Amino acid sequence: MQLVLMAAVLALAEVGCFGCHLKNVSIPMERCGQRVCIHTTICEGLCFSEDAVFESPDEAPEHRVCNGDWSYEVKHIQGCPESITYPVATNCYCSACNTKDTYCTRLYAHIPSC
């Protein structure tokens, strides 16, 4: 029974508290002297990645990171000629880290548990 439970937990780990997923966030901004709150979605979470004990210069392990598909929306503020264009994540997924647009290195930090 414990083996079945552990297998189920591991299978669900990708969608658990650390899995790559959409998250609603609010970002305070100021335009034309008015303070507005932008409500959008971002991608957050961790993806499975191997971190070898021995680092070979010939073969680096593939680092997987939480990426997403994005679109942009525009918020118009009444009485203000300036609008706010902001990104909105529409889908999140784990993919190989691309060094052209992402800082791909080890994470030396304490990761709290759920």
Swiss-Prot record:
| The keyword Secreted is assigned to this record | yes
Can you say where in the cell this protein is located? Secreted
Q: Which gene encodes it?
A: cgba
Q: Name one GO biological process term.
A: G protein-coupled receptor signaling pathway
Q: What is the documented function of this protein?
A: Involved in gametogenesis and steroidogenesis.
The organism is Fundulus heteroclitus (Killifish)
Q: Which family does it belong to?
A: Belongs to the glycoprotein hormones subunit beta family.
Can you list the GO cellular component terms from the UniProt entry? cytoplasm; extracellular space
| Name this protein carries in UniProt | Gonadotropin subunit beta-1
